[in-house]
Amino acid sequence: MIAIDPLKTDTMKHHRIASLLLSGLLSCGLAQSQSSREKMPRQDVVEVPALGGGLCVSNLFQTNMVVQRDKPVTIWGWAAPGEKVTVSFAGQAADAVAGPDRAWQASLAALPASTTPQVMKIQGKGATLELANILVGDVWILGGQSNMEFDLSKVNDGALEVASANFPQIRLLTLPQGKGFDSVRSFERLHEWSDWSGRHFRKGDWDVCSPETIKEFSAIGAVFGRRLFMATGVPIGLIDASIGGTTVETWTPEAVMRGIDAPETKDMLAEWDARIAAYDAQDDLRKQIANYEKQQQKRAAEGKPLPADSKPPSALRPGPVADKNRPGHCYAGVIRPLEGLAVTGAVFHQGFNNCFGGSAGARMYYQVFGRMIAAWRAAFNDPELPFCIMSLCTAGDPQTWENFLKPMYDVGPLIREAQYRTFRDLHDAGDKGIGFASTFDFRKSFYHPQIKVPAGERAAKWALATRYGLLGGKDAEAYWLPPSIKEVKIVDGTIRLTMSGNIVTKDESDGKLLGFAIAGKDRRFQPANVQWYTDGSVNDRKQPQYQRNVLVLSSPLVPEPAHYRHAWARNPLTNLVSERQVPLATQRSDDWLLEETPEKIVMPENMPADGAKRQAANQLRAELELADTERRIKEAEATIAQLKPAFEKAKAAMQEKKAAAAKKRESAAGR
């Protein structure tokens, strides 16, 4: 990393430069040309460091920001030890004194929402900082991994959202990845290099929402914020704190996880401790140099020129201690710099990178996730902070009726189940701030499904119904709350589920009710035939009367069902929703392990470890495909058996009719 504008002791000069960066640079530097990007080195380029000398304020506080309404406002920064600092804003002033560590913190009383741009002044002994164009409204945190991070310009209908994004009262901030455990209560403002994309991304600056500034912003966040602003007229500040390829444990304080007394979490922490202890930076450098020399020799042997700027590795790498998925790393580097900030709430969309740990990893997720939510609420000084869980999105080929069982063998639904269980634990205990939104029903194969606009709208429905009270009135929950299962009964070879409300098909489509699988005690699942319950009564037209809040699950291949699963695949086959089109979430009644269902019932023993595991998994999937084929054959045979008597009867009647007609013709010809 290099810094192109390091802070000097002349802090007034620095902060005037910072103010310019937040106004002039933000308006013209955002549209950085490709040629200027190419001039930058392939590494992070820092414009404003996280912490400067003399009087300075956390980079969280800038020109163009939104200050949270209706909550005390805390501002922090650094100055010379013992220096008095005065913060003035919106007719208020608060004093603070820098401590021995240079840190100071001042608090202002809660303010009402205001669309009038205002100036915040931070005055020290010999310098005054001015932050302009600040609004007072609602600040929302956007967390998770790449599906939250995914650019608005790249999603379905994103071009329209971008082109119509002239909303000067919406403000945007995308945070950098941070420094992990070395972070302070601030962050760098920089051009962040991405090896994945092969380019720089501008991070750490508050922007006024426009087509230019929003195009690379979080698609879900942009749609969410826009819908809130259009409904409320209150200024909206969106802080994108998501980082691609991250796990739930990296977003949770390490100390919180150390306090979890559960074997799966303890094992995960022990594995990380062992990796960190075993890492040898010198040995790693030797391997880097050896690989570099090998590649250079290969290029020379192939007659390819050596790059002019090619140099052998010389720097020691920090190794796993700096891995972004080290437990607590992203919390320390991204969330901790925000601690103490007043915000309205958070939306969190994550899960993909936790889909590689089998049943143990899913159990660890459940152990950690609720505590992560509590830690975020503590960070923002609000134990009831509104927090919306967006469940794991789809990936892979869609599950179909013909290919039903193989897709069930996946960690994805286990992670989704852990997310939904966490939500239910909190909601059913009376947590009024917790929210939930499914995204699996959009049914895209790409693990970055580009249907983000309706995903953002689902989160907005939750916020408008709960935080703002602008959607649904007394029936507000109906617009976002997933239907729940209130009662389960085993009746005459079926599983009967009583739901919290009526269940219909998505978009009121015709056809079968889809989405459930059932199994007996043998743990062999089959797709269930799903019907609404009827007690045999009929209406005036002799049509059966259905209770649409009661579902009956059955399968001729499961004569004694014991358990059910719903939406049990990474890209599940289901069309069951509430009357307000809220999907029925991924859930199950059993607690069987992935490694026991279907492995133990298909294979002679447990899945082997190491090199043989992939081969065994392929064998398992082939077995499941055969089981699906066997079921389809039996379904076809049953269909034939059902249709054959009527077919034979109709065929015989047709033959009799033909014979009678022929006889009649012969009789007529004889006359």
Range-by-range predicted roles:
Residues M1-T11:
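Short, Lys/Arg-enriched N-terminal segments with co-localized hydrophobic residues
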Residues D10-L20:
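Bacterial N-terminal signal peptides that target proteins for export
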Residues S19-G29:
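Bacterial N-terminal signal peptides
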Residues Q34-L624, T629:
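Cell-envelope and extracellular/periplasmic
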Residues K613-R671:
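Extended amphipathic alpha-helical heptad-repeat regions
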